Amino acid sequence: MTEDTKVDLVRSYSSGMPGRALNQARMHHFVLDSPSGPNEALTNSEAFLAGISSCGVTLIERHARDTGVPVTGMEVTIAGRRSRADPTRFQRIDVRFDIRGVDRRQAEALVETWRNR
């Protein structure tokens, strides 16, 4: 690995309960469940989708701030669609951005910045 490479490290451990994993990222610890397990915590797919949508929020807010675009708030909704016959794969992922404080042209440009990252 080169010095210009950033590595994000996450570790997951068995919990002793089928369908539940204990996870660690930096100094943060969290539980992820499988729908076939306890299904009390976020599921793996929900955590995956949250990573994508929260990336949209933080990247767009930072880019708007850095370029002087007056975003006053935003909401990103993401829906992952899977077949009941094969729920291990997403068939489609839809992402909707509601960005406040800007006109449609500015919002579309901000979303395009996210898409290109």
What are these regions (language model features)?
Residues 55-56:
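Alpha-helical metal-binding/catalytic segments enriched in His/Glu/Asp
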